Design a protein with these regions (language model features):
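C-type cytochrome heme-c attachment and multiheme electron-transfer modules
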Residues: 23, 35-445
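C-terminal motif of bacterial Sec signal peptides marking the signal peptidase cleavage site
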Residues: 18-22
Length: 445
């Protein structure tokens, strides 16, 4: 009986499935209806190519990009080797530069526990990236038009890191565009070895006979302002400070600290970004051999590389002043400043007769292996940690004379480095350059 009921139930299911299947099957197609009314045409979209070629054309971006390849920002920047260094990268990598500008990072030192900390830094995650177009033109690809070239990343007044933010550079010409350059092209701070705060440069001028380093590296250090080593220096980008007439150790003297007209009426762009000529001008940022910026309306007339009053004479004056100051920076006939005849590593080879590079003549076989050979009158003993020296190098170091420095000598070293590494031999700011050098010469015995 149960089997019969099961068979009967299965039959009903099959019949039901057939009925439902038949109900869902489409019927025959009906007669076609009349066509509906056409809609209106849509609005044409924006031509993307037309927007791009406003900038990406042979005469605009392509030209600037080619010029940039010839610039030191393009091929010689230290972005790779400094990447990750939160102190150095604000001037060596794109992300770090944009970070300090966007966040208005102060160039101050603050006390943290028992030591001072340099606040002008980025963070590890924003410490990479080559210098590119967007480093200075941070609004690129915002509206996708020529308007994106400006505003520049910053034209604000620049707080000087060398002075821990107590001095400021603000160059007014061309809407402050030079401030963008000076943001990086400025000297770095000297740190007082005993206090760890920024060096008190004013004290160097008010107490010139005081001791900056007494020749003993006692621990803890309670007296020495510096422990001089080969790399005790202002770094390399001093041009902004000299151009602005700020930042030097201003010893009192007979030569007044004034500026040439360049400081008020000229901009970096006037001379370094003129019409391209060979490997100079435009976004090469190279001014070598170009005088169109000098010969602009309201400035000079007919100035060339052979012009005496405004080119050859002032440069010769500054070179002689550098030589005269170096001659006074000696101890028992031994140069305090380092000589380096190698034209590849010494960018300032031609700026002084004895080919000083701005470093100190202190023994450092790691970073300056040819130091003793390059300085025939002698080299001073290393004052810092020598644990990385081989035993033979330690033996050499032990036999070398000890260096000592007065405040006047330390301040004069700083001024020598500022004026040498300005790299213009006074053209940026002849009056201020000569005041620093002449008054430094006069303060030394």
């Amino acid at each position: 009986m149960k089997k019969n009921l099961l068979v009967l139930g299965m039959g009903f299911l099959l019949i039901g499935a057939s009925i439902f299947s038949a109900c869902t099957k489409e019927g025959p197609m009906g007669t076609a209806g009349s066509n509906g009314k056409d809609g209106s045409n849509g609005k044409d979209g924006t031509d993307g190519t037309a927007s791009c070629i406003q900038c990406h054309s042979p005469a605009v971006v392509e030209l600037a990009a080619t010029q940039f390849e010839l610039s030191k920002h393009g091929y010689g920047e230290a972005a790779f080797e400094e990447g990750g260094n939160v102190i150095c990268t604000p001037c060596h990598t794109s992300q770090a530069f944009l970070y300090v500008c966007k966040n208005n990072i102060p160039a101050t030192f603050t006390l943290s526990g028992t030591a001072y900390v340099n606040n002008y830094r980025t963070i590890a995650t924003e410490s990479l990236g080559d210098i590119t177009c967007a480093t200075c033109h941070s609004s690129l690809h915002t509206t996708y038009s020529k308007n994106d070239f400006s505003p520049l990343t910053t034209v604000a007044a620049v707080s000087m890191t060398m002075w821990g933010g107590t001095k400021e550079i603000n160059l007014p010409a061309d809407g402050g565009q030079s401030n963008l350059c000076v943001k990086c092209h400025q000297p770095r701070p000297f740190v007082n070895a005993s206090t760890t705060n920024v060096m008190d440069y004013v004290e160097l001028t008010t107490n010139p006979t005081g001791s900056a380093y007494d020749g003993t590296s006692e621990s803890p250090n309670t007296t020495d302002k510096t422990r001089p080593g080969y790399r005790t220096h202002t770094h390399y980008g001093t041009a902004g400070a000299v151009f602005a007439g700020k930042g030097g150790v201003e010893f009192p003297g007979s030569t007044a600290y004034t500026n040439t007209a360049h400081t008020a009426i000229a901009s970096c762009q006037d001379c370094h970004m003129g019409v391209q000529a060979g490997r100079a001008g435009g976004h090469t940022f190279n001014a070598t051999g170009k005088f169109d910026g000098c010969n602009a309306s309201g400035c000079h007339t007919g100035l060339t590389a052979s012009s005496s009053p405004f080119w050859t004479t002032p440069r010769a004056d500054v070179k002689k002043a550098l030589d005269d100051l170096a001659a006074k920076l000696k101890i028992n006939g031994v140069d305090i400043l380092n000589r380096n005849p190698d034209g590849e590593s010494n960018l300032w080879l031609a700026s002084s007769t004895n080919k000083y590079d701005g470093y100190l003549n202190v023994y450092d076989p790691i970073n300056n292996p040819n130091g003793i050979a390059n300085n025939p009158a002698g080299t001073f003993k290393a004052t810092g940690n020598t644990s990385s020296f081989s035993q033979a190098q330690k033996d050499i170091n032990a036999a070398l004379p000890t260096i000592t420095l007065t405040n006047a000598q330390l301040g004069s070293i700083i001024n020598f480095q500022l004026c040498l590494r300005d790299y213009s031999l006074g053209i940026h700011n002849y009056k201020y350059t000569m005041a620093l050098l002449k008054n430094s010469i006069a303060i030394l015995p």
